[in-house]
């Protein structure tokens, strides 16, 4: 019996791998929403807020995650995760798993709870990722302390802020900063966590551009045949057709790690 989970920020194309696993007779729990997320999510959300209490914000764009790797995991946290995953963990299916983007926010303790399962780290170019809203855009909703978006804009990108003369443009710019901060934070928490025994990184763009080759990698990793789903090429590189800012320089480290081009 194998257990699989997906790590990746919301609006990162994670529904593609969830739908692929569902099409491949992997039980992903029930009920599911259109994105292939296991519902209801409330216990997972509470688990995110519980873990966030042990993350130390060091100011600016730095967090200390170190105690997450050594402190006792609170019983309340494990109870919440077992509540959320009850249908998956008790299912008799040979291959099963779950997907919800908020798993990324609790990744350090999920790895400690489930060290032997198979993890798929699903990444997407943040320039596309920050164009649309997701529940994790404002990390304060999950107990995470991070810089105020308008203060950050004023100090690091004053020209962008000054150019947003229309209220709607300014509001969208602020949300893109928050989404970029969310992407950056989630990259940081994953990067700071010792990786489990079974770990693979897959770029959404590679899945869209060459599904056959990407699935071959995943089939070798998971040890099961995978079904094909319909993908749309226009989901890659949307930032080229979008108005407004889609890049902030604090994204550079993560983008380089995953091989994304840095705009000049």
Protein language model features and the residues they cover:
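PAPS-dependent sulfotransferase catalytic core
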Residues: 1-80, 234-238
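Short aromatic-enriched loop/helix-cap "lid" or pocket-rim segments at secondary-structure transitions
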Residues: 110, 131-136, 141-145, 213-215
């Amino acid at each position: 019996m194998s257990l699989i989970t997906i790590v990746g920020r919301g609006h990162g194309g994670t529904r593609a791998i969830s739908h692929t696993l569902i099409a491949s007779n992997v039980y992903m729990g029930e009920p599911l929403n259109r994105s292939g997320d296991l519902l209801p999510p409330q216990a997972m959300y509470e688990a995110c807020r519980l873990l966030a209490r042990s993350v130390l914000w060091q100011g600016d764009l730095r967090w200390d995650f170190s105690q997450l790797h050594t402190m006792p995991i609170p019983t309340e946290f494990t109870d919440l995760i077992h509540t959320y995953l009850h249908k998956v963990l008790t299912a008799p299916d040979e291959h099963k798993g779950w997907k919800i983007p908020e798993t990324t926010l609790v990744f350090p303790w999920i790895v400690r709870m489930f060290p032997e399962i198979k993890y798929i780290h699903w990444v997407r170019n943040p320039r596309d990722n920050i164009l649309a809203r997701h529940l994790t855009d404002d990390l304060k909703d999950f107990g995470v302390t991070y810089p105020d978006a308008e203060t950050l804009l004023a100090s690091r990108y004053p020209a962008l802020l000054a150019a947003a003369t229309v209220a709607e443009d300014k509001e969208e710019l602020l949300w893109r900063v928050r989404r970029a901060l969310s992407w950056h934070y989630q990259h940081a928490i994953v990067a700071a966590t010792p990786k489990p025994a079974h770990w693979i990184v897959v770029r959404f763009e590679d899945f869209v551009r060459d599904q056959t080759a990407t699935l071959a990698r995943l089939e070798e990793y998971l040890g099961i045949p995978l079904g094909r789903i319909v993908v749309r090429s226009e989901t890659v590189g949307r930032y080229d057709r979008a108005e407004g800012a889609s890049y902030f320089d604090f994204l550079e480290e993560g983008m380089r790690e995953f091989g994304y081009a840095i705009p000049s």
